[in-house]
Amino acid sequence: SQWMWGQHFPQMDARNYVSDTALFIPRRPWLAASEVFGMNMAVWTFDRFLMNEDFAKINGHTIKQNFKTGPVWDTDKFSTNLVAHPYHGSLYFNAARSNGLNFWQSIPFAAGGSLMWEFFMETEPPSINDMLATSFGGIELGEITYRLSDLFIDNRSHGAERVGREILSGLISPMRAINRIITGEAWRHSSSKGRVYTSVPVNFIVGVGPRFLAEQEGSKHGTTSMHVSFRLDYGDPFNDDFYSPYEWFQLKAGFDFFSSQPLISQVNAVGAIWGKQVWSKGPRSLAAGIFQHFDYYDSELKSNSSQTVAPYRISEAAAVGG
């Protein structure tokens, strides 16, 4: 059994929200680039001087060797490569988005941040899969978190409500919070909400309940966890003749508590990069488009298991389809 709760924000007859930040936020590409550089330097400083990691002990020779060796395919930890790297890429992407650059203009910042890290900030050879996951996964997670953080911004609020909104928005998109502090928007009061997107229809569902995971031949000896899942639908792909990047997306995630399974067991995201309504008749309609996908499934062996391979580990951090 599973307990579920959902919240629906009203649907619209027609789209009346804007798809580009250029009209709302001044473009500050040099500040965005500085933040990407500073982010990499901060992570490297932590790894080098606090954690004393060997891979962070870089010098001119290691950088030259990285360019000489060229990119290779690495076999680092599954969650590091396919969750941590895409999340890091989302911070690069959001450094640009929160400084007034639109979706397409922000893509080079995700790719550039990854290239800087892989070629300059580690003694290990540049990783092909890390660059792909950080760049493409970062683009998708970055745009999703940017738009979700926008839902909580309200410059009309004050007091405890304002603090709560800024904290929640900042947890979703840390780079946006940093830039709101830099520009003073975090405490500036105005007569408007100060959001980039307005009146976006949103569906949100949360589920909580036990989860049992076992291999078929050993179904009596699996693991039980407290599973928390959520699903969020943003926008409506059937409510407009044409839509641009991420006016519609769906995000699902699952978390396992009190078990040997990974905390993050599942992440699924699909967003429309471009789409168009191709047929409509009464209440029925058909839309076609190009969609970006992010899928991640992780599991672990039981602590007393005699097996050597986890039941499943599946991911696609860089995928596009129609």
Language model regions located:
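Alpha-helical transmembrane segments that form the membrane-embedded catalytic/substrate-binding core
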Residues: H88-G89, M121-D150, L168-I172, R176
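N-terminal targeting leaders of membrane proteins
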Residues: S1-A84, H88-F93, R97-F103, E166-V309, ...
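Outer-membrane beta-barrel translocator/channel fold
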Residues: P125, N129, R147-G159, Q292-A310
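Alpha-helical membrane-inserting segments
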Residues: A42-F46, A96, M116-F120, L141-S149
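Small-polar-interrupted transmembrane alpha-helices in polytopic inner-membrane proteins
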Residues: F103-T123, S135-I139
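Beta-strand segments within the central parallel beta-sheet cores of soluble alpha/beta enzyme folds
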Residues: S106-A110, S157-R162
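A cross-taxonomic marker for long C-terminal extensions/tails that follow the last structured domain
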Residues: E316-G322
